[in-house]
A protein has these predicted regions:
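Catalytic core of nucleotide-sugar-dependent glycosyltransferases
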Residues: 171-174, 181-212
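General helical secondary-structure elements
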Residues: 55, 88, 198-201, 224, ...
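Nucleotide-sugar donor-binding/catalytic module of glycosyltransferases
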Residues: 1-189
Length: 237
């Protein structure tokens, strides 16, 4: 299969090496088409800041296949994640600490209350049955830093997600506050929050979305309002 590579301000040497193994696609519509045309039965995402244990893919694949043989509504799996605090210095990464991120999530299907804690299940800890993703993913903006959580809420309204209580994914947090080495969503937290809200509002306005999805989104809005009112009341006292 002929590999197609489009270069956009990325190191030429890196791209040359990468092109021998993978296709790099930047256009969003091309990504959607590539997902549809792929012969793979599964789909996963890797944030460029994060990392996996060597057995991540094989372990999640085997557990998901086993679970699906019993529970047909389970079309995705997420493992426990460790938070890695680190500093980037030139070409070196210095790890300061590693600690549990979401180890409170029990084995089994995810409860709906997980949606109240944004990124409690990180993008890089999930593996999906590809066919279950196709109809959902096209409603979301892949190029947005806030892509995953609105997509995950939408996905959870239509599918069950199984939790594997094994820490096989690593959620990296750069302590640098500069744009070269820091985490985009941390440095641009306000923009990230705005894009999440816009995506959630768009889903709430869509007449095509399920009633369950609208209930989930309404609960998020009500929960946010409750915390804001409580904060104001505490300030008044």
């Amino acid at each position: 299969m002929e590999e197609e590579l489009k270069c956009h301000n990325v190191d030429d040497f890196y791209l040359k090496e990468l092109s021998n193994i993978y296709s790099v696609i930047y256009d969003e519509n091309c990504i959607f088409n590539a997902i549809k045309m792929s012969e793979s039965n599964y789909l996963c995402f890797m944030d460029d800041d994060d990392s996996w244990a060597p057995e991540y893919v094989s372990r999640l694949l085997s557990v998901l296949a086993n679970i699906q043989s019993t529970y047909s509504s389970v079309n995705a799996i997420a493992c426990h994640t460790n938070k890695v605090a680190e500093i980037a210095e030139n070409n070196r990464i210095i790890i300061n600490s590693t600690q549990p991120w979401n180890h409170y999530l029990n084995a089994g299907p995810v409860s709906f209350d997980v949606i109240y804690y944004r990124n409690s299940i990180p993008l890089s800890s999930c593996l999906f049955d590809k066919n279950s993703v196709i109809d959902v993913i096209e409603s979301h903006k892949l190029s947005s830093p806030a892509f995953f959580w609105p997509f995950f809420i939408h996905y959870l309204a239509e599918n069950d997600v199984w939790i594997l209580p094994e820490a096989l994914a690593f959620y990296h947090f750069r302590e640098n506050d500069d744009f070269e080495f820091g985490n985009y969503t941390v440095i641009n937290n306000e923009l990230f929050d705005i894009e999440c809200k816009i995506a959630e509002n768009k889903m709430m306005r869509s007449i095509d979305d399920s009633s369950l999805l609208n209930v989930l989104l309404s609960n998020i809005a009500n929960n946010s309002l409750f915390h804001k009112i409580s904060y104001i009341e505490n300030k008044i006292k």
